[in-house]
Amino acid sequence: MGRFILFFIAVIFSGSVMAEWTQLGDDVVKSVGIDTGRGVKTFVNKDGIDKSGQWVVMWTLRNYESPVKLNGKKHFSSKSLEEYDCKDMQYKTLSFYWYSKQQAKGAVVYSETHHGDMQPIIPNPIAHASWKIACGKRLAKQGNNN
């Protein structure tokens, strides 16, 4: 248990210190409970990828063009630690943080740690690109779903 806590703390700090973020694309938020029609830019930290067999851990950052208000809390960016199952094309969020400013800066206005089940990769270009980067797959050309 103690080793898991130390690993988790190390992973949290490694995703924050001098992270090199690579933009995956622009999208529009269309989630239940969140104001829709909001532009969002999604980034991943390729340098912070941690692989162990078919399992990979990678940070994802989202910047919102206007503040997102959810459960009475506003944030301009969110950072999440995702675990990917490269063999079975699944993922789960291990933890996430909401920040008062873009690029995961400013105050942390909310955070949560998850221990949920793996979910299939959503057939969405941004989520699929994240999985491919995390798992070391070559990004397919536009229009090719393989």
What are these regions (language model features)?
Residues F4-F13:
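Sec-dependent N-terminal signal peptides
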Residues V17-N146:
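N-terminal secretory-pathway/extracellular module detecting exported/lumenal segments
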Residues M1-R3, A19:
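Absolute protein N-terminus
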